[in-house]
Amino acid sequence: MKFVDEAVVKVQAGDGGSGVVSFWREKFITKGGPDGGDGGDGGDVYIQADENLNTLIDYRFQRFYEAERGENGRGGNCTGKRGKDIVLRVPVGTRAVDIHTNEIVAEVAEHGKKVMVAKGGWHGLGNTRFKSSVNRAPRQRTLGTKGEIREIRLELLLLADVGMLGLPNAGKSTFIRAVSAAKPKVADYPFTTLIPSLGVVSVVPEKSFVVADIPGLIEGAADGAGLGIRFLKHLERCRVLLHMIDIMPIDQSDPVQNALTIIDELEQYSEKLASKPRWLVFNKVDLMPEEEANEKIQEILDALGWEDEYFKISAINRSGTKELCYKLADFMENLPREEEEVAEEDKVNFMWDDYHKDAMAGKDVVTEDDDDWDDWDDEEDDGHVVYVRD
């Protein structure tokens, strides 16, 4: 199945049902009191994570999703039925972004998690709600409010522990083939990797981690050059980044400048991503004598002012890869897991007294004009007579 990690859809929550003006009808009772029921709330729109999905391709073909409208109220104080919600099933790791504000509306990082992306409209009030001692035959009602409409961009972010960075042909895919069972395409031309791929590395039965390989970056990627920085989002949840550097590029470019290019593009994309733990991995050390390779690596380290972790490997020969994997496993075992930023959910009060109190006093009240059959007069109430049997 084609890998699709981004799709734009329009979602519309259901409108709230309107209240109704109605009066009690019964044999021998010509004109009864008000019995107009409230409308039903509109249905909401949710996204829900499903571990059985791994692509957003379905949302490329259907772009509009609408929840059900709430039913209008009815006589006999019958409340309208609530509109049915609609749930969009997405792969684990998907987030929804409002395309107009770039606000992250929802994010589902674990199976079964369900988050609302569009709120249904409030129900309207029937005329029973307006009954009072001075208004015994109310003809007022309120209409249901409109449901929320949003255009959202669904973005699938791969869930991996280790993310790989580097220019095209640096050896990222070769490394994943060497340390895992994944078999991404490998060739001697740029941009062999066109979509992200994942590999599971099992150091020992009790220790394993997931590595993500993304298409190579080039200078100007932040401005859209090459494949752009579209795939960098897949590294946002990684706990450590491996910056792969080819010490003997096939195009004879400067490894120092190549490394600076990646660092610059990373910083332009996201300060948060640039601040993640990052290790340098010098690849293809088998292409030159050991002493010469060590001198070249030290030269690069000095030019970058690098004082953190670095490793020397030959991915194609699997030289140094085992040691690197053990180091990664130990590092992540001791690294405190990041706490997810969970936005505090809006507290929605479904009691009508708060929201509808304002609506009843405002301009949204609709008055039905029909005075012909009203047997209630507007004179001052003389009180009620209570009969008591001795």
UniProtKB/Swiss-Prot annotation:
It comes from the Bacteria. InterPro entries: G_OBG (IPR031167), GTP-bd (IPR006073), GTP-bd_Obg/CgtA (IPR014100), GTP1-OBG_CS (IPR006074), GTP1_OBG_dom (IPR006169), GTP1_OBG_dom_sf (IPR036726), OBG_GTPase (IPR045086), P-loop_NTPase (IPR027417). Gene3D superfamilies: GTP1/OBG domain, P-loop containing nucleotide triphosphate hydrolases. It is found in: Cytoplasm. It is an enzyme of class 3 (hydrolase). PROSITE patterns: G_OBG (PS51710), GTP1_OBG (PS00905), OBG (PS51883). The keyword Transmembrane does not apply. GO terms for cellular component: cytoplasm. Its cofactor is Mg(2+). One of its GO terms (molecular function) is GTPase activity. The keyword GTP-binding applies. Belongs to the TRAFAC class OBG-HflX-like GTPase superfamily. OBG GTPase family. This is GTPase Obg. It comes from Vibrio parahaemolyticus serotype O3:K6 (strain RIMD 2210633).
